[in-house]
Amino acid sequence: MLALTRKAGERIVIGDNIVVTVVAIKGDSIRLTIDAPKEIKIYRGEIYDAIAAENKEAAVLMDLAELTALKEFHIKK
């Protein structure tokens, strides 16, 4: 992990195609702009955590017996 100190107007360059700029600092809030290619998904931390939790819940393992029954039902049709 890299920890950096930046002032308003200063930027951080990640790789060749991502630029993070500190736009404003007010109290304990920092306003950033992120310039990155469209194919790179950018999420706030709490949104990313919610997506990860939803994906984990959606990845429920099926009982193998249920899959076998489904296969047999499809073959009988």
Swiss-Prot record:
Belongs to the CsrA/RsmA family. One of its GO terms (molecular function) is mRNA 5'-UTR binding. One of its GO terms (cellular component) is cytosol. InterPro entries: CsrA, CsrA_sf. Homodimer; the beta-strands of each monomer intercalate to form a hydrophobic core, while the alpha-helices form wings that extend away from the core. One of its GO terms (biological process) is mRNA catabolic process. The keyword Amino-acid biosynthesis does not apply. It is found in: Cytoplasm. Disulfide bonds: none annotated. Coiled coil: none annotated. A translational regulator that binds mRNA to regulate translation initiation and/or mRNA stability. Usually binds in the 5'-UTR at or near the Shine-Dalgarno sequence preventing ribosome-binding, thus repressing translation. Its main target seems to be the major flagellin gene, while its function is anatagonized by FliW. This is Translational regulator CsrA. Keywords: Bacterial flagellum biogenesis, Cytoplasm, Repressor, RNA-binding, Translation regulation.
